[in-house]
From Swiss-Prot:
This is Pheromone-processing carboxypeptidase kex1. Residues 1-19 form the signal peptide. GO terms for cellular component: membrane; trans-Golgi network. Keywords: Apoptosis, Carboxypeptidase, Glycoprotein, Golgi apparatus, Hydrolase, Membrane, Protease, Signal, Transmembrane, Transmembrane helix.
């Protein structure tokens, strides 16, 4: 009797710990509402705690690559803001799916998961599906990078089979600040690691699209871009008025050259948008000047896919499928005004100052721009390159006074843009593209990525794209539909039975789970009730249209109310309910014999278990 009671008491004490300790299986996405017919792509999603005292958790959504080319690669994708969700990238840009409507997904022809594992992360804490107590939002870029290292350490503990992949960090807009800081933090972490006990992470490259990297070059470019695109006529009375604002901006930059945000410079963009409205009070879309929008939104209602993304991600079925923690009490919002207004980076230097050392350390960097974006336009990016010194030269110098040529890129017979390269830095200008290049040109953007990662498809097959620079046909990359090739399709079929049973295993410990299942369920309810008591308060945010352009950007589409404390709208979630489709789960391209021999993939069973957007 006493022994039985003691045993029960022991299990009750340790059960919360067992329940709180997660494995890869707890993150496995077994079904995804609205997914296309056929086997479901291999994916994991959920939260990882990065700040226990303040209930800080980052949300991730991971897709395993469809095919392995010559080596294993992982691309980490971040959107900007700060405070804008990387689900923008997942569902509107580079992810394998896009939304046809509020309930239905379709394949994205040109998704970046063809030859790379994709890891989307909502960060900093409080962004998208991530959460934290509202008095604990981050302020500085080094704080953000430190938390991201904590996230990666824990993520690789859950998924050790990816830890020796070649790592590329990609993103757009304000992620142009985040990415170099994270890269520097990874290098600092690697210096302290004993490779015998913990792996050094193979950081290979950074990919930044329409990046907010160098405010000192980006702010003055607004007016030059307006002249170049014909939004404002040079020498006109409007141009003279705007010159006054430009002069104030330039003086502020001279006084504070290391500032990340300068409100007086944002007035230039505000004036361009407000003073170029048409007779219907429609302003230019700051993300794509080929379009117009109602004032003062000026692009906040873009892109059109957003009308489906928000209700889809707020659907109960999707929230359940993506393993969202009960602690996340508010529905998904694209951008958090609370996060953006707190993340001032007042004591941080612009990330452009980190680029030379990263380039000189051997990290390759790709900067790309859509030519129709105003807010983070290509003129500013080109100016930062021209003024930057690294690896013994300035800008795209190949030798003193000689600059690398701007080479013309064609894709499937059509002009696609410009390529330029020197000393580990590549620049690509996309023609007829917006702030979100992969949204407009998914296949061209994937072609760019594959070339930058030096993908070799010799062992894969498939139909390569006709991609040329200055008329010279480039090495073959395949950017066709899904599956990539008949060989890969056959390989997938052979893998189905092998991997199906593993989808529900838990790090090879299924038998143990059966034994302790009853105890852990009991412990889960105890743990859950404790965690729920660690809630957080809300912070009221400004209405759209108030404040500076960047403040509006950070408050973008986050709703008129509080984004961090607002409960789910029960009736809305019921209306948006879409039946979850149970699908066959499988992975493509697991064979270790296709890996780089210098980067063997561990056989850990856990892999199979489970301001600017």
């Amino acid at each position: 009797m006493t022994m039985s009671f003691c045993a029960l008491l022991f299990f009750l004490i340790i059960s919360p710990t067992l329940a709180a300790t997660k494995s890869a299986a707890d993150y496995y996405v077994r079904s995804l509402p609205g997914a296309p017919e056929g086997p479901l792509l291999k994916m994991h999603a959920g939260h990882i705690e990065v700040d226990a005292p303040n209930n800080g958790n980052l949300f991730f959504w991971h897709y395993q690559n469809r095919h392995i080319a010559n080596r294993q690669r992982t691309v980490i994708w971040l959107n900007g803001g700060p405070g804008c969700s990387s689900m923008d990238g997942a569902l509107m840009e580079i992810g394998p799916y896009r939304l046809k409507d509020n309930h239905t997904l379709e394949y994205n022809n040109g998704s970046w998961d063809e030859f790379a594992n994709l890891l989307f992360v909502d960060q900093p804490v409080g962004t998208g599906f991530s959460y934290v107590n509202t008095n604990s939002y981050l302020h500085e870029l080094d704080e953000m990078a430190a938390q991201f290292i904590i996230f990666l350490e824990k993520w690789f503990q859950l998924f050790p089979e990816y830890e020796r992949d070649d790592i590329y960090i990609a993103g757009e807009s304000y992620a142009g600040q985040h990415i170099p800081y994270i890269a520097k933090a990874i290098q600092e972490r690697n210096k302290k690691v004993d490779d015998k006990n913990s792996a050094r992470w193979n950081l290979r490259g950074l990919v930044i699209g329409n990046g907010w990297i160098s405010p000192a070059q980006q702010y003055p470019s607004y007016l030059n871009f307006a002249y170049t695109e014909g939004l404002v006529k040079e020498g006109s009375s409007l141009a003279k008025d705007l010159d006054v604002y430009q002069s104030v901006c330039e003086s502020k930059i001279s006084a504070a050259p290391n500032a990340v945000n300068i409100k007086d410079c944002e007035s230039v963009l505000q004036q361009i948008l407000s003073r170029t409205m048409d007779s219907e009070r429609k302003c230019y879309n700051m993300y794509d000047v080929r379009l117009r929008d109602v004032y003062p939104s000026c692009g906040m209602n873009w892109p059109s896919d957003l009308v489906s993304v928000k209700p889809y991600l707020q659907s109960r079925d999707v929230v359940r499928a993506l393993n969202i923690n009960p602690d996340k009490k508010s529905g998904w919002e694209e951008c958090s005004g609370a996060v953006g207004s707190t993340f001032t980076a007042a004591n941080s230097v612009p990330s452009v100052q980190l680029l030379p050392e990263l380039l000189e350390s051997g990290v390759r960097i790709l900067l790309f721009s859509g030519d129709k974006d105003l807010i983070c336009n290509h003129i500013g990016t080109e100016q930062l390159i021209n003024n930057m010194k690294w690896n013994g030269g300035i800008g795209f110098e190949t030798s003193p006074g000689v600059w690398a040529p701007r080479r013309h890129w064609t894709f499937e017979g059509e002009p696609a843009g410009i390529y330029q390269y020197a000393r580990n830095l590549t620049y690509v200008l996309f023609y007829n593209a917006s702030h979100m290049v992969p949204y407009d040109l998914p296949r061209q953007s994937r072609d760019m990525l594959d070339r930058f990662m030096r993908v070799d498809i010799a062992n894969i097959g498939g139909q390569p794209a006709d991609s040329r620079i200055d008329g010279e046909k480039l090495p073959q990359t395949s950017v066709g539909g899904h599956p990539n090739s008949t060989a890969a399709e056959q390989q997938a079929k052979e893998k189905i039975k092998e991997t199906e049973w593993k989808a529900y295993a838990k790090s090879g410990e299924a038998a143990l789970i059966v034994v302790i299942i009853g105890v852990t369920v009991w412990g889960f309810f105890i743990w859950r009730s404790r965690r729920r008591n660690r809630g957080y308060e809300g912070v009221y945010q400004k209405e759209l249209g108030s404040g500076s352009i960047l403040e509006r950007f950070q408050n973008k589409r986050s709703g008129a109310g509080d984004v961090e404390a607002g409960d789910f709208d029960e009736s809305e979630l019921d209306t948006l309910h879409s039946p979850g489709l149970e699908r066959e789960n499988y992975a493509v391209g697991d064979d270790s014999d296709e890996d780089d021999p210098n980067h063997p993939r561990p056989t850990a069973s856990s892999r199979e278990d489970g301001t600017h957007p």
